[in-house]
Amino acid sequence: MLIRNVIERITGENRLRELALMVAQSCGDAIWTRVEGGIETMSTPEARGYVRGRAGIIVRRQVSTAAQHNDVKPSRHSRLLELTMQSVIDGMIQ
């Protein structure tokens, strides 16, 4: 039983990561229009915070929709949000 739980946890995390990447890609253009003029002169930590702040509403809405359409358990919504936000930030700061 323990091995089964570990496998389910690993595959569930992988599924969340894939979904987070898809959600991040789907809202990337909308977020880029909000941050494109401001992050060039910022330090990396400052730019990460700026992107996080400007992307918040868009990402939360997209994650909520994706979670409903993909039957993500409510207990995993916050993890999906965290993974998606990280993907968005990484994509904008590269």
Located regions from the model:
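Protein-protein interaction and targeting regions used for scaffolding, dimerization, and localization
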Residues: 2-94
